[in-house]
Amino acid sequence: MLDRLKSIEERYEKLNELLSDPEVVNDPKKLREYSKEQSDIQETVDVYRQYRDASEQLADAKAMLEEKLDAEMRDMVKEEISELQKETETLSERLKVLLIPKDPNDDKNVIMEIRGAAGGEEAALFAGNLYRMYSRYAELQGWKTEVMEANVTGTGGYKEIIFMITGSGAYSKLKYENGAHRVQRVPETESGGRIHTSTATVACLPEAEEVEVDIHEKDIRVDTFASSGPGGQSVNTTMSAVRLTHLPTGVVVSCQDEKSQIKNKEKAMKVLRARIYDKFQQEAQAEYDQTRKSAVGSGDRSERIRTYNFPQNRVTDHRIGLTIQKLDQILEGKLDEVVEALIVEDQASKLQQSEG
């Protein structure tokens, strides 16, 4: 571990030199690339230096015990050794976590897709609750939410809603939302007061850059049609809605949220690029999962990950056995407690795998 940390520190010093080089300063692409690389290893280098300093102080304190000391001084040195041992152990554990390979998608924006599944209209209404929850969470994080496509039902729910959340580290926190979300509550339309169970599925895709997914125009079929509102009625006589089909993979994306066909095509391309990138990622992950499986779940979108129980104001995350009696707050976007618990569990799992 120490050899690896030393080489990371050497790379950090080299990046300092490169970022002062006039040739790099005048090259925006290289400047951005090196700045990001340095930012990514900054915390690791800082903690390593703290660890090294504490280790040196610990060695010096232990050496002092070999000298002739009076009883009071000896007790002081022993106390210092005890504190420094705790500090080095804490820093060592932090370094182990920092050395876990980082998900290359963590810093990206995220495209989220929510679909009402089992439960008909009640599932569509629950999809709306989830969309609002994620929108509020994004707002609390200082992120921006933009709807890409929405299929609204007559009662104001969503058969499907696709939206992008833009902000630093958005994917790193929301990627754990992949899967089936279950709701237990009494529907407003239910006169008998019986609790119904419905589900909605959530997919989280990292936004893909053009350089990451090479899509050729010849591989895309573009269809245009008149956009429609709730219930299917036409709301636009112009052919502004766009459907893109990526012929090699069969991935299809529609967008009719904007009045302009050009803007709809731009939005659809973002979703198409993310879905194709995600398809490749899923295939690579499937190979990896044959040998190892994460403790916080496989990321399989059919996997039931969480239950929202309205009568008991309870949320349960089944992957880590977390139960919180704060459903009302969570639906208002206060997801930090859940997200942080999932991150900690994921890091612990990866650490165990790397040590195994």
UniProtKB/Swiss-Prot annotation:
Alphabetized Gene3D superfamilies for the sequence: 3.30.160.20, 3.30.70.1660, 6.10.140.1950
Cellular localization per UniProt: Cytoplasm
Modification note: Methylated by PrmC. Methylation increases the termination efficiency of RF1.
PANTHER family, per the entry: LD18447P (PTHR43804:SF7)
InterPro entries: PCRF, Pep_chain_release_fac_I, Pep_chain_release_fac_I_sf, Prokaryotic/Mito_RF, RF-1
Protein name as annotated: Peptide chain release factor 1
Main location: cytoplasm
Function statement: Peptide chain release factor 1 directs the termination of translation in response to the peptide chain termination codons UAG and UAA.
Organism of derivation: Bacillus subtilis (strain 168)
N5-methylglutamine found at: Q233
Family per similarity comment: Belongs to the prokaryotic/mitochondrial release factor family.
